[in-house]
């Protein structure tokens, strides 16, 4: 059976910064309040005419500039996003059109903040099955376009960015060690953006086109769910927390991550996040954290890393990987 590993990374964030001081002028909040509750200091915001596909394309360009091989033989593009430019066509098709790779599949994944880890899980399966050889897994979000800037509990959280990872066949070294998935569809009404249907689980939805979140309930679900799945994932791989070099959870909220780490045997000091300077970027947060660690010289080849994406659905995917770069 073929093996798969991550061989390249690229990221992009818009130049405009929205700081806590800026938010103080928009809603009744303060830098102290935001930092104390979320750990966030700023987030990036796309321009009016800049959309998710534009950010994804820039992230792939960044990856391409750092990758020693060619991307002309990419045979699948997977884009994780909740803020696609259009209902259809997919954002993945817009990325394909820009780069002109005609012999490639292209599809979007809508798993909110778990989108990147779902994409990596699928890429691993497609490659190890022998169906594909080189897959671009991209995460892109322009959450600012669906954020209600009159709601101080949510508008302080979200930012825009994109990231890309290249997953390739490798006959020698497996880069994916184990995975776990789970879904709690009965929690679909605590984090959503309404569409054609105006109710879920018997709950009437707010049809404003903006994100709606019950932050307290999302926090409780994540803090309750992730620690147990963290342990289950290590057990599936026959590893312990002592074998783990880095933990990279979805950067939803630094206080949430601290709460999760308190319930695991893994120290917060070995947890990688992107929340302080990028806010909650949904599916993008994990790849941003990885790239920050690469650039800082923290993340090194063959280190064992646990990725855990969780979010609206409610759904999650955890992956144990061996870093391939």
Curated annotation (Swiss-Prot):
CDD domains assigned to the protein according to its UniProt record, in alphabetical order: KAS_III
Pathway: Lipid metabolism; fatty acid biosynthesis
Reactions accelerated catalytically: 3-methylbutanoyl-CoA + malonyl-[ACP] + H(+) = 5-methyl-3-oxohexanoyl-[ACP] + CO2 + CoA; 2-methylpropanoyl-CoA + malonyl-[ACP] + H(+) = 4-methyl-3-oxopentanoyl-[ACP] + CO2 + CoA; (2S)-2-methylbutanoyl-CoA + malonyl-[ACP] + H(+) = (4S)-4-methyl-3-oxohexanoyl-[ACP] + CO2 + CoA; malonyl-[ACP] + acetyl-CoA + H(+) = 3-oxobutanoyl-[ACP] + CO2 + CoA
Stored InterPro entries: ACP_syn_III_C, ACP_syn_III_N, FabH, Thiolase-like
Enzyme class: transferase
E.C. numbers: 2.3.1.180, 2.3.1.300
Subcellular location: Cytoplasm
Positions of the UniProt region annotated as ACP-binding: 251-255
Chief location category: cytoplasm
Biological processes per GO annotation: fatty acid biosynthetic process; secondary metabolite biosynthetic process
Induction statement: Down-regulated by FapR.
Catalytic residues identified in the record: 113, 250, 280
Record keywords, A-Z: Acyltransferase, Cytoplasm, Fatty acid biosynthesis, Fatty acid metabolism, Lipid biosynthesis, Lipid metabolism, Multifunctional enzyme, Transferase
GO molecular function term, any single one: beta-ketoacyl-acyl-carrier-protein synthase III activity
Family according to the record: Belongs to the thiolase-like superfamily. FabH family.
Function: Catalyzes the condensation reaction of fatty acid synthesis by the addition to an acyl acceptor of two carbons from malonyl-ACP. Catalyzes the first condensation reaction which initiates fatty acid synthesis and may therefore play a role in governing the total rate of fatty acid production. Possesses both acetoacetyl-ACP synthase and acetyl transacylase activities. Has some substrate specificity for branched chain acyl-CoA, determining the biosynthesis of branched-chain of fatty acids instead of straight-chain.
Domain text: The last Arg residue of the ACP-binding site is essential for the weak association between ACP/AcpP and FabH.
Protein name per its UniProtKB record: Beta-ketoacyl-[acyl-carrier-protein] synthase III 2
Gene that specifies this protein: fabHB
């Amino acid at each position: 059976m073929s093996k798969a590993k991550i061989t390249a990374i690229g990221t992009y964030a818009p130049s405009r910064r929205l700081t806590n001081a800026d938010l103080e002028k928009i809603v009744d909040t303060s830098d102290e309040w935001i930092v104390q509750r979320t750990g966030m200091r700023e987030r990036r915001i796309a321009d009016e005419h800049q959309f998710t596909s534009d950010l994804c394309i820039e992230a792939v360009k960044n990856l391409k500039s750092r990758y020693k091989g060619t991307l002309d033989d990419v045979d699948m593009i997977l884009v994780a996003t909740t803020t696609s430019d259009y209902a259809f066509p997919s954002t993945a098709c817009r990325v394909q059109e820009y780069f002109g790779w005609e012999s490639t599949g292209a599809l979007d994944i809508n798993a909110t903040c778990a989108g990147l880890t779902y994409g990596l899980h699928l890429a691993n399966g497609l490659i190890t099955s022998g169906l594909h050889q080189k897959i671009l897994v991209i995460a892109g979000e322009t959450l600012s376009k669906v954020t209600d800037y009159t709601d101080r509990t949510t508008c302080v959280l979200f930012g825009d960015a994109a990231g890309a990872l290249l997953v390739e066949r490798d006959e020698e070294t497996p880069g994916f060690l184990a995975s776990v998935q789970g879904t709690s569809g009965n929690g679909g009404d605590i984090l959503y953006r309404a569409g054609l249907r105006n109710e879920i689980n018997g709950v009437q939805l707010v049809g404003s086109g903006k994100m709606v979140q019950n932050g307290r309930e999302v926090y409780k679900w994540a803090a309750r769910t992730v620690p147990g799945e963290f342990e289950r994932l290590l057990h599936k791989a026959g590893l312990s927390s002592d074998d783990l070099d880095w933990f990279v959870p979805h950067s939803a909220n630094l206080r949430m991550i601290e709460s999760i780490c308190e319930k695991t045997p893994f120290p917060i000091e070995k947890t990688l996040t992107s929340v302080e300077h990028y806010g909650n970027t949904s599916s993008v947060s994990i790849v941003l954290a990885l790239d920050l660690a690469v650039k800082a010289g923290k993340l090194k080849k063959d280190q064992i890393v646990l990725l855990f994406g969780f979010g609206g659905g409610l759904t999650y995917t955890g992956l144990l990987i061996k870093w391939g770069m």
